[in-house]
Each structure stands twice: as C-alpha cells, then as structure tokens.
Amino acid sequence: MLQRGFTRFQILPSLIALALSAHAMAQTPTAVPAVPASAASAPAAAKPPADPTAPKPFADVIKDAKVEDGLFPIWRKDEKVWMEIPKAMLKKPFLFTVNIANSVGERGLYASQMAGDWMAEFRLVGKQVQLLALNTKFRSLSGEGSARAVEQAFSPSLLGSGAVASLEHPERKSVLIDAGFLLSDVPGYSTRLERAYRLPFAVDKANSSIEATRAEPALSTLTARMHFSTPRIPAPPLVPPPGPVPMPTPPQATPDARSLFVTYVYNFAALPSAAMEPRRADPRLGHFTRSFTDLGSDLKANPRVHFVNRWRLEKKDPAAEISEPIKPITYWIDKNIPVNYRGAVEAGILEWNKAFEKIGFKNAVVAKQ
C-alpha cells in the first residue's frame, strides 16, 4: 500500500513536467528551413536552339573562294559556285542566252547551236532568287496605263530559281545565290532529245557540273556540262506484230545509248544604257525579224508589229563620210575549225566590209580567233 502510493506520487510530477514541456513546444513556432536565394528565383527560360537553315554571314560562306568580278560577280571554291546579285540588278532586265557548246553529233543535235534567248530578270522571293523570262510577246507602245494592263494580263515564265546562300552583303547589300540551279534543263533540251529518239531522257543533276566561269563588266558566263540519261532502252516485241509498230530509235553516236552529255553556255549580258532606234520591217525586203503584238490601241486592224534584227553600228566620227564604228561586228573563229580552213573562213567574214563601206563604215566587221 505504501509502495503503491509512493509510485503514484513519483509519476505525478513526471506527468506535470511532460505537460508543461508540450505546452512550451506548442507556444514556440516551428522553424522553417532557409531556402537559398538562387533556388527561390524562377529558372531562366532556355535559349531556343539556332535555326540550322538560317543563312550565314556573306563572308563566312565565301571564305577562301575566288571571285571573278563582272555584271554578276562569280564566286568559286572547289566544286561550289555562287552568283552575287547586286541590289541594283534585282528586277532589272538583262539579256539571257543559252548556247550549246557540245552535243550528241547526230539527228540535228550538234555543237555550236543556239538554245534560246530571253529578256530576263532576277526577283527575290523569300529565300529564293527567281530567274524569270519576261513576256515580250505582248506589249503596249502607246502609254504607261495600257502597258501596265498588258503586263498584268500575260504571265512571265520561270526559268529557274536558286536558294539564297547567305545574308546580304553588309555594305553592297547584294544577294548571294547557289549557282547550282543552272544544273537543270533551263532551255528544255530534253524535248529535242525526245523528238529525236522518242525516249524519256532527263537531266541527271548528280553527274552534271559547272565546268567554267567567266565574268566581265557587261557579261557573266557559266558553262555547265549536263548529263542526260534514260533508265532503259525498250526491247522490241517478242512476237512481231501483224502491222508496223513504231519503236524508239536510240542514239547511235554514243557508246551507251542510255547516257549522253550536252554542254550549256549560260550568258548574262547587260542591256545598253541607251536603247537603239528600232527599224520596222518592210515585207518587200528580206530581213530576219522579231515580232510581237501591240495591244496599246484597239483601233488597229492588225496589232502585229515586225522589227528588223540588226547590228548596232555607230560611227566614231559622225561627221566623217567614212568612219570606223564605235563597236564593230565581231565574229569569233571557233577553235574547232581546222587550222588550214581558218584563213578562208576569216577572208569570207571580212568580205562583208565592202558592203558596209558603201554606207559609210570602215572595218565594220572584224574576225578574231
């Protein structure tokens, strides 16, 4: 009894001490762990990755490349070729021609042929520079208003387009384009091949290349070796048909009828600063002419207009009875002409000077090799 009471009195002070301790803990606020300032602030937004398709600075793209200054400067590094389009030449017409330097050698597909000529211009559209053939078949010779209406009524043609290869030049503001767009069938030569062989020859860009370039103040030239191929030559029918069946006629002048090369020479030439006075054609005289439809007036019975194709000869001394021209008519004797024939060819060219002397021009025609 005494032992049990002693135990009770011993426990009671302990319970009171525990109660007071719990009350004190309740009155003391719970400590909150300190948060570092760097962790408290919101994380910075991640920087978006660079666009891999974004154009690089001009200088970075043409680093170590060699340049030929001209109407359109040409940059070349190994197999890469670029054309620099001056800002002033965007939407400015120039003469664009394509010549055939090498071809198959049969069925009318020969070297030294013309493949087309156009009045053209470059236009910047987004990240592409378009080479457009302007529509000169329909014009207006009477006024600006009708000329604008004619321009809106008839479409130009897209000859090709090149990707913008860099940012514009920081000082010149010019545009750099990849000249690889010229490794395509710009003059439509595949149609000539199909007409000759009735086979679907097409450009093989992977095996085509720009062989040579040349640039002058008024001219830029690029020479492209184009590979044309067709997948297969059709076999004749196993059993002869009862009647005649037209069959493709493969090339006979190539080692493999499925493959051939054609060389294009692209010429970009500046137009003269002052236009030449045109001369209308007279049907009573024989001339090579250039024709178009004049829609400037609706009162004409026949809107077709014919102009004579002629050389631009201007006297150095307009007051002289006979004067040399400012720029003579120049014929280049091709290196393919055999040496023993070149003298005769040159003499034949220069024989025309006798006719020009009668109209006041001396040495109007020159021959160069």
Question: What do these predicted regions represent?
Answer:
Residues 1-8:
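N-terminal secretory signal peptides that target proteins for export/translocation
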